[in-house]
Amino acid sequence: MANGLKFSPRKTALALAVAVVCAWQSPVFAHGSEAHMVPLDKTLQEFGADVQWDDYAQMFTLIKDGAYVKVKPGAKTAIVNGKSLDLPVPVVMKEGKAWVSDTFINDVFQSGLDQTFQVEKRPHPLNSLSAAEISEAVTIVKAAPEFQPNTRFSEISLHEPDKAAVWAFALQGTPVDTPRTADVVMLDDKHVIEAVVDLQNKKILSWTPIKGAHGMVLLDDFVSVQNIINTSSEFAEVLKKHGITDPGKVVTTPLTVGFFDGKDGLQQDARLLKVVSYLDTGDGNYWAHPIENLVAVVDLEAKKIIKIEEGPVIPVPMEPRPYDGRDRNAPAVKPLEITEPEGKNYTITGDTIHWQNWDFHLRLNSRVGPILSTVTYNDNGTKRQVMYEGSLGGMIVPYGDPDVGWYFKAYLDSGDYGMGTLTSPIVRGKDAPSNAVLLDETIADYTGKPTTIPGAVAIFERYAGPEYKHLEMGKPNVSTERRELVVRWISTVGNYDYIFDWVFHDNGTIGIDAGATGIEAVKGVLAKTMHDPSAKEDTRYGTLIDHNIVGTTHQHIYNFRLDLDVDGENNTLVAMDPEVKPNTAGGPRTSTMQVNQYTIDSEQKAAQKFDPGTIRLLSNTSKENRMGNPVSYQIIPYAGGTHPAATGAKFAPDEWIYHRLSFMDKQLWVTRYHPTERYPEGKYPNRSAHDTGLGQYAKDDESLTNHDDVVWITTGTTHVARAEEWPIMPTEWAHALLKPWNFFDETPTLGEKKK
């Protein structure tokens, strides 16, 4: 994991007028001798800093790692993280170009003010595979006699060492002496192959063909599909029915076909994609121009269209709908600046992050995105276990329209496409605040080549309101601010962009926020307004959000895999249900409030709908706080959101999707820890006929009492479209929480008692 910052001129100002390529000798003096001047923009960009010029303030803003610098041309001082710093040589403007001393970087950025990044002395055993390790793994598998030349790679990731050994490293510093090992998932035409590779000894430990699996959709499949569509004379003829004579203006979206037990007429063992298309009209938003009721079924092995499915011809909506501001005058806003005058409150040592009392490891996986590991909380000098691993487990976006172009749409974004592979680089000041540190991440592409994603993850601290407050009459106010540390990651899957925040509170709470933004998948219809004759039928499965455009009703359902280890691995699922009970103690009251507490002892019983009026805890019954209560963490799958809550799958129980992906319908699942059980939708969900995920994991109904348990929470929203979300959707959130419950002895943010 490495930090990487990018050049981004401020929108309200003119871009830097400093496009020069050679150094300039200037009559500027430093410490009595002539200074050597170099171009500001080129020098700072090569250093990896973010450079902005504010034309109104006549000021440069320079951002690198934890340093936030403001400097005006000619000034003898710069403001670094809110503090004044003397400059031996000022910034000089000459002929509209900015120049700095060749010692400027050392003077400003290496002035000892920032200690965010620390050198990792002992590599964490869960560190992501390096670029060299990825290349080594590919070299080893390519040398295997079973390897075929046309094989592609869908995942190359760390094969995790033993969990107990990793915890021993995190808690006691005990070295993990097992060799670094890689899991390699390959696709040979339609055949999926798994290999485990010993990188240290350069040998293959296992080579396993996976029968009946279809594997992920890879990025080169998108290119193949576009070429197939563009060169198909059959498809070109069908396009003419829709008034389209140039197939080159058609943009394709390859989609998985789902499973309908043969009722869709598709051969189960073929590697197929369904393709819906849009017209590129030049407005920058082809999503606004769907070619409705037209679906091409593409065979990826044969590289041809095997079937075209059609419904009634609907004219392509042609009204321009750009969302990039080309036709708008956006109101200017005054700058909002966040400075950290004394540096950051967190440090990043290799891939391990320390903030306040929290320590955790962070890596990026090509399927599920960030994985947070060995999460601990320092409680008055004692490092306490909270969670071994937490990550997105999987997600699904199912649509409720039965028409020809929609009935199969149920996007398993991580399981079918790989959301880590589709990571969207974070833009400072827009996708994350200006004080964020951006981390680059390296994963493998489909050829096996290591690829670095710049700005893949953002880390930042933020003010989050009062942590606590009380004003007693006649006494001074007592209050303190709440701080949060946010780990942000964004993945763009087709039309939608998903923002995931892991939010650490200094009081021991962990928030998990999932936000959906981007562009709705819309349907072309005849109706322009709700007064048109076809409007009622056109909006049966959605909302008319523009002339001739319906936003279809669907769900965004997220599942998070949370291997909580509350003060150790032996945990128990406990229920607490507040109830009204008769008052038997006398007095005028007829009723009381009491809590019915009981243990949920098996996997089948643990799979539940979430009732926000109840409490579910993962408890360590062998550990107590000072009052004798077992230490616990509360599990809150849905802690609010900005769309209606997805309280279950909006499908009839006889639907195949309901049976294949049962994780959708219940918000709480708890299973025994097994290292191979990682995905709620199963490892290979593409065209799967049965539930190979959580439904299968819980089928044997293992005991959960005093065992190493894994919590899975399903959360999300049911998305009923509205006009305010078109042509681009404001971010809509779903929130989940993990809260300490008698884990501490008192309010944890009071601090340590004075000696």
Which stretches of residues belong to each language-model region?
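Extended intrinsically disordered, low-complexity coil regions enriched in Ser, Thr, Gly, Ala
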Residues: 50-56, 69-79, 112-120, 148-149, ...
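Short, non-transmembrane alpha-helical segments in secretory-pathway proteins
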Residues: 125-170, 218-262
